[in-house]
Amino acid sequence: MHISSTLAVPDTADTPHHVAIIMDGNGRWATERHLPRMAGHSRGLDAVRAAVQAADHRGVRYLTLFAFSSENWRRPAEEISFLMKLFMTALRREVSKLNDSGIRLRVVGDLSAFSPRIQLMIREAEAKTATNPGLTVTIAANYGGRWDILQAMRALVADQPDIAPEAITEEALSPYMALAYASEPDLFIRTGGEQRISNFMLWQLAYSELYFTERYWPDFDAAEMDRAFAWYRNRERRFGRTSAQLEPGTAPALSAGA
């Protein structure tokens, strides 16, 4: 299990171990080109392929993509229907490619809201790539940060119905979070110009570096990822410490690997 950044100082590197992305701007990309919004979503799938490949080639261990939030059900029915079809198309076409590249696919969120067919396709995709040792790509679908915390609390109490309130700690709750298998994101990226986290990974983003770009998701490519990584390398990641404590020769802080 990965240690919480609020309990210990995690190991860091020039390349982020875990990158989380809100893929925003598909609709606006299409509108500015006088195209239907669906065209933006289709083009966005190309950007997903590029992001996965770029992350894999740069040594990222975990890439988490916010594909569909629990609030996205409020969108027009036609758009939701198209997104579901696009999701199934992506699962059919991309899983074998991911598997051939040694990439593992995981999907997190309240999957009960999806059709039985989509749920089956998700299970099959996860099973097919389960033993792959490379990059883990997580698709957050019908996911919300508040949902994640609530479902973790419910699962904890279901497993330990007699647990005392004082025993409900970060260490106790963390194994029940949807992304318990991954380290906390080092770098959060949001495309499309908005500057908010939109109920995404509220628990896990506690000490993530937040990078916002005006570029719409369909235009996101390896060069834009490199710009985000260059910005990340210039960040001073203190995790509650002072800058002076980061100077060479100072006493080492507790490490997650200690």
Swiss-Prot record:
Substrate binds at residues 25-29, 37, 41, 69-71, 73, 75, 190, 196-198. One of its GO terms (molecular function) is ditrans,polycis-undecaprenyl-diphosphate synthase [(2E,6E)-farnesyl-diphosphate specific] activity. SUPFAM superfamilies: Undecaprenyl diphosphate synthase. Mg(2+) binds at D24, E209. Its cofactor is Mg(2+). GO terms for biological process: polyprenol biosynthetic process. Its EC number is 2.5.1.-. InterPro entries: UPP_synth-like, UPP_synth-like_CS, UPP_synth-like_sf. One of its GO terms (cellular component) is cytosol. Keywords: Magnesium, Metal-binding, Transferase. Gene3D superfamilies: Decaprenyl diphosphate synthase-like (3.40.1180.10). The active site is at D24, N72. Binds 2 magnesium ions per subunit. PANTHER family: DEHYDRODOLICHYL DIPHOSPHATE SYNTHASE 2, DEHYDRODOLICHYL DIPHOSPHATE SYNTHASE FAMILY MEMBER. Homodimer. HAMAP family: ISPT. Catalyzes the condensation of isopentenyl diphosphate (IPP) with allylic pyrophosphates generating different type of terpenoids. Belongs to the UPP synthase family. This is Isoprenyl transferase. It comes from Ralstonia nicotianae (strain ATCC BAA-1114 / GMI1000) (Ralstonia solanacearum). The gene is uppS.
